[in-house]
Amino acid sequence: MRRNPKTLMGLILSLIFAMEIIGNGAGQTGSGKFYIVGMGTAADLITMRGVEVIKSSNIVMVASEQEREIWKDHVKGKEVWYCPDSLRIMYGRDPRTIQDPQIRAVAENAAKTRRELADRIRAAVDQGKVVAFLQGGDPMMFGQTFLLELLPKDLPSEIVPGIGALQAASAAVKMSPPYGYDTSGVILTMADWPGRVDNNEKLMASGSTMVFYTMLFDYPLVFSQLQRHYPPDTPVAVVIDAGDRATQKVVRSTVGRFLKEVDYKNFPAERHLLLVGKFLNVGQARKNGVSKIEKQHSK
């Protein structure tokens, strides 16, 4: 029996297409996706989108057992994977360039674990599963987003923003950081580290509002620097557990008095933010207004 050449060509093309689908892992369900979900700074600050994503997930990822307990209502009944914060150690460094054998071994192990975790995520998504990595606050501020850099660019993925420490701390003091009377800039920074080019001393020279994330923070050093660039009566505020109605606390002082009157040594590690700037007192007032905007609104 003779075959129609067009029919035969169609069968061949269909077979090639099917083989490609099987080969690249697609076509199983087509609904697999990797999410990074910002959980907010408190259990009740998760967004509606975040809740829906977690409900739809087959696998959830957390950094620790503590986080699993905090988000137990969301994690219940899900397969749980762990991605500890320590996996960020030496990310971006080539272990082969490290001379110290012990440090090199740590870097090699971290790189290997990151790669294995990325491979697991890819395999799960290729199988049509939804993987949701839950992260406190907003993942775009010191979160673990490096996994997206290790995954194929065409892998379906999405970041669900969360209410971060900056937003929650600003709400706690009931003042908006961009309003600094005669400044508009807001500098988000952290403790200095060796090799850093934009060190805090340089940033302070602008006189802008400053927001310090306090990991490994040296208060005496930072305030000795602040005192060289800000008037002693410049207001400061430390917000502990920003956004948590049960434990949130605001400690107020000034650049000149802080080290003398504040018990900063007993602040809970990595659970507080330092705000520095005139906005804490003046609110939304401007020194001379903004004439261009005022003219637009007067028309």
Model-derived segments and spans:
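Bacterial N-terminal signal peptides that target proteins for export
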Residues: 2-11
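Class I S-adenosyl-L-methionine
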Residues: 25-160, 272
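Short gly/pro/ser/thr-enriched loop/turn and capping motifs at secondary-structure boundaries
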Residues: 67-69, 88-90, 164-168, 185-187, ...
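Class I SAM-dependent methyltransferase SAM-binding "motif I" and its flanking Rossmann-like core
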Residues: 135-207, 248-252
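Short hydrophobic/aromatic-enriched beta-strand-loop microsegments
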Residues: 78-85, 156-160, 177-184, 231-239
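A contiguous loop/helix-start segment that scaffolds small-molecule binding in enzyme catalytic cores
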Residues: 29-36, 103-110, 123-131, 148, ...
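Bacterial N-terminal signal peptides
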Residues: 10-20
